[in-house]
Amino acid sequence: MAQTLMATTRPYVLLSSTRASLYRLFQSSKRPFASFSAPLVRFTNSRCVSAVLSRKETAPSSIYGNRVSRVSGFGALDIRSLNFSTKSSQINDAGSIDQTLMQSMELKIKEQLNAESVTVTDMSGDGRHVCINVVSSAFEGQSAVNRQRMVYKAIWEELQNVVHAVDQMTTKTPSEV
């Protein structure tokens, strides 16, 4: 079982690890295992391993060489060899899909609740956070929680796909307006 780096009260502590991972970390086979004088490794509270240089050295090139490396639990890793990619989402710039989304939400609420007035406002600029104001006679005799449930039920499909959260919701009856 490989031993791991541990945080101690001393700032420059190198606890043992496997010889192969140290070799890969410092990229030098000429230095013996116990004689790392300049660069040391310490373990920080955020579970990141960072290189600590002695006072003589000014650049981390002796640690990483020309390669961009990061230390993982299994030794050093060349991060350029990893394939990073992102997946584009359905949401484009503000105003492209959002207006049709807001209008479809307003239409669904009006149809299902026979609402007199419905306003759906984009709060975040990308359609993920919305503010909803509804005036409907269907809210007569309903508690505030049940009124919100009725609105959520009407726009459930949008809440599952594009809309992340309803930041504010106002539900009133015509007599309360």
Curated annotation (Swiss-Prot):
- Source organism's superkingdom? Eukaryota
Q: According to the UniProt entry, which residues carry N-acetylserine?
A: 88
Pfam (any one): BolA
Query: Keyword annotations for this protein?
Result: Acetylation, Chloroplast, Mitochondrion, Plastid, Transit peptide
According to its UniProt record, where is this protein located? Plastid, Chloroplast; Mitochondrion
GO annotations of cellular component type = chloroplast; mitochondrion; plastid
Organelle transit peptide residues: 1-87
Record flagged with keyword Transit peptide? yes
Q: Work out whether the entry's keyword set contains Electron transport.
A: no
What the entry lists under InterPro entries is as follows:
BolA (IPR002634), BolA-like_sf (IPR036065)
Subunit composition?
Interacts in vitro with GRXS14, GRXS15, GRXS16 and GRXS17, but not with GRXC5. Interacts in vivo only with GRXS14, GRXS15 and GRXS16.
Q: Please describe what this protein does.
A: May act either alone or in interaction with glutaredoxin as a redox-regulated transcriptional regulator, or as a factor regulating Fe-S cluster biogenesis.
Question: What's the family?
Answer: Belongs to the bolA/yrbA family.
Protein name per its UniProtKB record: Protein BOLA4, chloroplastic/mitochondrial
Gene responsible for this protein: BOLA4
